[in-house]
């Protein structure tokens, strides 16, 4: 093989995600999860995404009364619809194409279906994309979360579980900061009312999710390389999608409201080692690894707790509670309204400046917004 021609896909062994992250299956309290979900009305936002769709598949097994799935991506939603029709014929499933930012559409949904449990997985998640589009991080991630959270309270949802990220900890990019602001809002709203319990789950990268390194590396290996890694020292915490989703459900049963649950992600993984392992497992030869440099807003390593946070154990060995600073609801709401107004100007610098005011620990890395840090 001359290294120039495309490798035949048939010559390469299909790399299984589980081979890349060998570990014991995480056990969860199935009885508690069943009690929470069986016979209930469950809403999942971002239901077409990697996490949302897996939560949907897991929830469907517990026979909820009604499963309401919302996402703006029509084709993946159609895929989920077909999956449910095939695998859960008796299950009442609603697939709604819509945006969490469309307040009127979401209000109609809540009025008609009054979900008892909400799993909020909808978000823009790609760091470089949000560095270039901070207005959309504000309007989709922050405002969209507020729309769904407020409607949950208005229509008497019992529990709202938000999916957050380790990028919200000491954020270095717009995406991470937007998720930290969502966490702050959920905690403040939890303390502000007694109807709905707001719980946040925070975890790192999930292996094999849409647009993550695994599918990208697979494609690069298939083409004969090079495999592009941003930096030789970059490390990330990884989980398998099903184990992350199982822990989301477990945290949902545990949360009494106001908690930020942090998942034990195991040992961090060097991305370059992951690339080498994938090349070896695929059986490919002479594949070069090249380093492209850190992307805008990218950290060398992620943290699951911020500098001033500490964590408390829970009954589950893989789940801890982060003790974080909380803010009064009126201040949080005022900040969000101001930030949304600024986002309508699509002035990137002004938007990020306000985000840094709200989250003072947000310090930009490899980014045009570094000029805003003092």
Where are these regions (language model features)?
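Flexible, Lys/Arg-rich cytosolic regulatory linkers and terminal tails that connect or flank
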Residues: 1-41, 153
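Strand-loop microenvironment adjacent to phosphate/nucleotide-handling motifs in alpha/beta enzyme folds
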Residues: 27, 32-34, 188-374
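Proline-aspartate-enriched helix->loop->beta-strand connector
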Residues: 64-65, 110-119, 127, 157
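N-terminal Rossmann NAD(P)H-binding glycine-rich loop of SDR-like oxidoreductase domains
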Residues: 42-62
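Conserved glycine-rich Rossmann-like NAD(P)H-binding loop of the short-chain dehydrogenase/reductase
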Residues: 64-79
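Conserved residues in the N-terminal Rossmann fold of short-chain dehydrogenase/reductase
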Residues: 96-97, 139, 291
């Amino acid at each position: 093989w001359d290294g120039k021609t495309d490798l035949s896909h048939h010559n390469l062994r299909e790399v299984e995600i589980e081979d890349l992250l060998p570990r014991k299956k995480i056990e969860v309290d199935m009885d508690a999860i069943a009690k929470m979900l069986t016979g209930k009305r469950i809403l999942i936002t971002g239901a077409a995404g990697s996490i949302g769709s897996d939560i949907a598949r897991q929830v469907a097994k517990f026979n909820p009364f009604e499963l309401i799935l919302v996402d703006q991506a029509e084709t993946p939603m159609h895929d989920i619809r077909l999956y449910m029709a095939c695998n859960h014929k008796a299950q009442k499933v609603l697939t709604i194409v819509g945006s969490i930012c469309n307040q009127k559409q979401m209000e109609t949904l809540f009025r008609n279906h009054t979900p008892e449990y909400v799993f909020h997985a909808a978000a823009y998640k790609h760091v470089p994309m949000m560095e270039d589009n901070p207005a959309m991080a504000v309007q989709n991630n922050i405002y969209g979360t507020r729309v769904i959270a407020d409607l949950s309270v208005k229509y008497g949802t019992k529990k709202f579980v938000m999916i957050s990220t380790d990028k919200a900890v000491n954020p270095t990019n717009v995406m991470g900061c937007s998720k930290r602001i969502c966490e702050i809002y959920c905690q403040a709203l939890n303390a502000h009312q007694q109807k709905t319990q707001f719980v946040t789950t925070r975890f790192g990268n999930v292996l094999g999710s849409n647009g993550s390194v695994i599918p990208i590396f697979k494609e690069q290996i298939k083409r004969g390389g090079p495999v592009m890694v941003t930096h030789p020292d970059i490390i990330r915490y990884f989980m398998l999608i099903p184990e992350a989703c199982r822990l989301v459900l477990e945290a949902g049963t545990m949360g009494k409201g106001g908690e930020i649950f942090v998942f034990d992600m195991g040992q961090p993984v060097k991305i370059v080692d992951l690339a080498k392992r994938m090349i070896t497992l695929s059986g490919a030869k002479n594949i070069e690894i090249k380093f492209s440099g850190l992307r805008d807003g990218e950290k060398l390593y992620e943290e699951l707790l911020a500098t001033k946070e500490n964590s408390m154990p829970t009954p589950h060995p893989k789940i801890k509670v982060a003790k974080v600073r909380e803010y009064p609801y009126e201040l949080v709401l005022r900040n969000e309204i101001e930030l949304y107004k600024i986002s309508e100007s699509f002035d990137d610098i002004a938007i990020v400046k306000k985000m840094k005011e709200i989250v003072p620990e947000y310090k930009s890395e490899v980014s045009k917004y570094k000029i805003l840090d003092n």
